[in-house]
């Protein structure tokens, strides 16, 4: 019976095991171990029905994306876990916490971006960790903390690693293989491989390493090494594909005996591209450091930050250190910070920082130094209110003692608070929107003041502003204030205390004041409006002045050239037609002989009309008549026409000047006529001399006359003009008289008008007619004639 029950129980257990195998998986029950094989089954996640007693689990070649904490829970007996060739991008922390028996973990060919601190937590017996061909960009410092002493094989190749937790690698004392090839490593910490005595394979191929730290482990990679022990096996070392900087720092590596590697140099330029093992040792050289730039002197106010700069060059790049004035090596602390580029920042300066700071630049070839002189301006420290009440040992109260004494007899009493006394020693005046004048006074018995310090801050801001003032000044103008704001201001005195060898300070006094309000927008608008108004006013004044000036000129012109009504009524003029313009004279029928036509006389010159005043003609006639004898004047007075009384003498003008010249010419001609009339021979000669005028000779007189010398005449090559008399209708009337025309006996008496013409001729008139016509031509006009 017992045998039957045992058989049934064994059959049930076997059936249960077979039934627990996941779908699409193969479960093998080999003696005491159970293996679950699910490779390349298209799984999207870890099957939840996996037997928790599984020893070997293979899930490679699937499409698993995420690993959770429940996927491998309670699999304490799992020894080998393969998750290769999936698309795993995230592993939840503590997902492998129950895999305490796991020896081998394969996570290669996935998409893991990083390994966190708790990603591999719980793998206390892990020996093989394969994480190659991922996208690892960083590994946490404690990611390998649980299996540092048990790990034998670590493969991190074909990732994007810029660095490793080298401290953790240093403690992997049982490590046999370390694959770090095809990454972005550019630095290996010195002493990383010092304790890896069991390391048999080290692959650093295809990284960005420029140098390797010297380590005794690399001596086991020499080809001549024949002795090997299980505790110190030969080292297979590969570091090809790195841009090695072949200088004196790699001279130790060059001295190793290797004959089968093809490493090349990446720098310097003289060795670039050459095989590392073919370069002579003499060519591995370095350059000593040279400081190219540094701070020389620095003046800093106590309590403020200070920056000291020091730059150096060399091969290899030198390291820069700073030494304080007390020969102390300056490092990173809460008050100082040293950067890789050689800059030293002192965040808060003290009096102990005053002195020379030394910059030391050192490399494998030597060192260089430079000194930076730092001067700290010590600030006086404000004492509390309780210390002001009792006089200190340095007699600080003497500064304000005078103010107390001066007001001691004022009846204020001894009960007045002592703190109110120093406040009255400071006076603020001349307060504007952005400035204020501060004045203070101290007693003569006070110690010798070294310097004054002015402290003030805005009532809306807690920032305290300091101003250092020489001891010789007792007033100071505070500028750059904010308008419409209250300020608290205190004046402190500082001097050297001989007892403590420190700077002693005390408050001289305090005051409060408000700056005036400012309205910049309104003020600017007012100035703009005022400026525009001034421009308009000035422009209006200029325009009005110009208008008045123009009106005055017009009125003056009209007054000077206006003819009076009496003269216009008395004057009779006649139309004169040029002898060469082709016009016909008007008919003379009905006009009696000796009667003047009622037409204004004109002289035509180049089609330009120019009227001369009547006074000019009268002045010419009066000057001509005055040269005659008294008998002739009496004869003219008895004529049928009487001349009106002479007009007032006109103002000097061009017309008057020309008339004067004409009068002088006529006067000379009249004298010659008088001489000719007295002698018969002379009369005939005079008649003949004036009766033949050519077209080229002016009628005003011979070429040598004074009028001709003043009036410019055309030359031979130009149109010829002559000066002639134009008597208007007198010529026509004389022509109508039977008997033809006779030359005038006295030409000067009929010079009432002048005409410029090409063919001038002398018109015949009797002397009696001219005397009567003189009253008619009271006003004359000049007409310019066009010539053909």
Curated annotation (Swiss-Prot):
Protein's cellular compartments: Membrane; Synapse; Postsynaptic cell membrane
Family designation: Belongs to the LRFN family.
Gene name of the encoded protein: Lrfn2
Membrane-side (Extracellular) residue stretches: 21-534
Example of a GO biological process term: regulation of postsynapse organization
Domain spans labelled Ig-like: 289-375
Organism: Mus musculus
Residue ranges, Cytoplasmic side: 556-788
PROSITE patterns named in the record: FN3, IG_LIKE, LRR
Full protein name: Leucine-rich repeat and fibronectin type-III domain-containing protein 2
């Amino acid at each position: 019976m017992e045998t039957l029950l045992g058989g049934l129980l064994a059959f049930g257990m076997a059936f249960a095991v077979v039934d627990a195998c996941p779908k699409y998986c193969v479960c093998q029950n080999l003696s005491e171990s159970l293996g679950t094989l699910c490779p390349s089954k298209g799984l999207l996640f870890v099957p939840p029905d996996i037997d928790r007693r599984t020893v070997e689990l293979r899930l490679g070649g699937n499409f698993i994306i995420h690993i959770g904490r429940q996927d491998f829970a309670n699999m304490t007996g799992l020894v080998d876990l393969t998750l290769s060739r999936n698309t795993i991008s995230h592993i939840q922390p503590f997902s492998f916490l129950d895999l305490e028996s796991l020896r081998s973990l394969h996570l290669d060919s996935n998409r893991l971006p990083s390994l966190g601190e708790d990603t591999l937590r719980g793998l206390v017996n892990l020996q093989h960790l394969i994480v190659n061909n991922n996208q690892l960009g960083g590994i946490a410092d404690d990611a390998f903390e649980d299996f540092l002493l048990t790990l034998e094989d670590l493969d991190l190749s074909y990732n994007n690693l810029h660095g490793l937790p080298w401290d953790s690698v240093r403690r992997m004392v049982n490590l046999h293989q370390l694959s770090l090839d095809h990454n972005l490593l550019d630095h290996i910490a010195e002493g990383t491989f010092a304790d890896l005595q069991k390391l048999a394979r080290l692959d650093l191929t295809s990284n960005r390493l420029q140098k390797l730290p010297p380590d005794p482990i690399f001596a086991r990679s020499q080809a001549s090494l024949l002795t090997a022990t299980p505790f110190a096996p030969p080292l297979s070392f590969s570091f090809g594909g790195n841009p090695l900087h072949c200088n004196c720092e790699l001279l130790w590596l060059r001295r190793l005996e290797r004959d089968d590697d093809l490493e090349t140099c990446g720098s310097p330029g003289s060795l670039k591209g050459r095989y590392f093992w073919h370069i002579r040792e003499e060519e591995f050289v370095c350059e000593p450091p040279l400081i190219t730039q540094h701070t020389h002197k620095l003046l800093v106010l106590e309590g403020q930050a200070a920056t000291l700069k020091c730059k150096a060059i060399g091969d290899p790049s030198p390291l820069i250190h700073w030494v304080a004035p007390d020969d102390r090596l300056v490092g990173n602390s809460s008050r100082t910070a040293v950067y890789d580029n050689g800059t030293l920042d002192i965040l808060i300066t003290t009096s102990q920082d005053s002195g020379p700071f030394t910059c030391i630049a050192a490399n494998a070839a030597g060192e260089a130094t430079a000194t930076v002189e730092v001067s700290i301006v010590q600030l006086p420290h404000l004492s509390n209110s309780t210390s002001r009440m009792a006089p200190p040992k340095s007699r600080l109260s003497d500064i304000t003692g005078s103010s107390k004494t001066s007001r001691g007899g004022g009846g204020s009493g001894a009960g007045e608070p002592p703190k109110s006394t120093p406040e009255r020693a400071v006076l603020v005046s001349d307060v504007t929107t952005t400035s204020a004048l501060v004045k203070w006074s101290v007693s003569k018995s006070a110690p010798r003041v070294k310097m004054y310090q002015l402290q003030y801050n805005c009532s809306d801001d807690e920032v305290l502003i300091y101003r250092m003032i020489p001891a010789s000044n007792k007033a100071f103008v505070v500028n750059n204030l904010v308008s419409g704001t209250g300020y608290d201001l205190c004046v402190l005195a500082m001097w050297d205390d001989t007892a403590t060898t420190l700077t002693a300070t005390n408050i001289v006094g305090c005051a409060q004041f408000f700056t005036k309000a400012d309205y910049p927008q309104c003020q600017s608008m007012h100035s703009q409006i005022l400026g525009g108004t001034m421009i308009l006013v000035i422009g209006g004044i200029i325009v009005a002045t110009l208008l008045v000036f123009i009106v005055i000129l017009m009125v003056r012109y009209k007054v000077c050239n206006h003819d009076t009504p009496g003269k216009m009524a008395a004057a009779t003029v006649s139309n004169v037609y040029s002898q060469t313009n082709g016009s016909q004279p008007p008919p003379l029928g009905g006009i009696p002989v000796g009667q003047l036509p009622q037409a204004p006389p004109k002289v035509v010159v180049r089609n330009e009309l120019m009227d001369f005043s009547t006074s000019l003609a009268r002045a010419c006639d009066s000057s001509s008549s005055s040269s005659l004898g008294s008998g002739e004047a009496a004869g003219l007075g008895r004529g049928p026409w009487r001349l009106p009384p002479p007009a007032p003498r006109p103002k000097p003008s061009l017309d008057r000047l020309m008339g004067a010249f004409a009068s002088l010419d006529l006067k000379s001609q009249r004298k010659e006529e008088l001489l000719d009339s007295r002698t018969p021979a002379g009369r005939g000669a005079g008649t003949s001399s004036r009766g033949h005028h050519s077209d080229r000779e002016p009628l005003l007189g011979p070429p040598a006359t004074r009028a001709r010398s003043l009036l410019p005449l055309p030359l031979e090559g130009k149109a010829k003009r002559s000066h002639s008399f134009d008597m208007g209708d007198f010529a026509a009337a004389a022509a109508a008289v039977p008997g033809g025309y006779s030359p005038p006996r006295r030409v000067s008496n009929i010079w009432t008008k002048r005409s410029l013409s090409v063919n001038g001729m002398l018109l015949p008139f009797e002397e009696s007619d001219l005397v009567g016509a003189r009253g008619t031509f009271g006003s004359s006009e000049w007409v310019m004639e066009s010539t053909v």
